[in-house]
């Protein structure tokens, strides 16, 4: 395996280059096709911090760690009470004495950075309010399965400028995806995010941000949506329903896209809100393939990041008599 990612943190999609993303995806495809990735996590203990609830994230990471020979140890918000009972840095310094790496699903990107600064082993983001890099690896894998490529793939993201949207902007800039973001006025990605994505752009393929879905969908290959109200925004739910209502991914909206366009959603879905049952459960939906790809993408990422870590931290030899 390539050592380019060995021992590295993944806090943002922007931490990766195009070649590194391709290496993860190539290995993920190999794993999905039944290839043996070995046991690069043999003898390693992995601390999983879940400040927020998870379903796909926890299960996919735990299965991936087990398959690679490691041992996952999950800690939940009510146990660690990050920022209340202890600081992120103090928690990290203790976990660093027990575990060989940390996978963290947190509210704050600042806390994630603090943990990474205090832990000697690799730290992987399993989501913050700012970004969702592992989701994007699975998404890019799915796009490649559907379109046969990543560079130049025409992806329409319908939603607000949330963490997934931010990671999509960075990934699109790095990989050359033709990304079109459609949001109601006032819900666009932050200017700082757009500026950073523009700096990451490595070729002529650009991204656009607009309010009208029709021109964006005209030649779309992927129609991607996400919840209108993310965790922590519950007080805004009714207003968001009103503002986003015309952007529901239903059969009427999907008719604006070519017949071959496929639908993606990072889940969980609010059925009947941002997407209808008839679309989510249709032959045009690859949503559950996309969810499955979380396992393969994260398994590949772990195999590359922890490649050689066990050798650098060998098991102690038995004492001689």
For the regions a protein language model found, what residue spans apply to each?
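Rossmann-like adenosine-cofactor binding region
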Residues: 198-278
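Glycine-rich phosphate/diphosphate-binding loop of Rossmann-like nucleotide-binding domains
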Residues: 51-64, 147-225
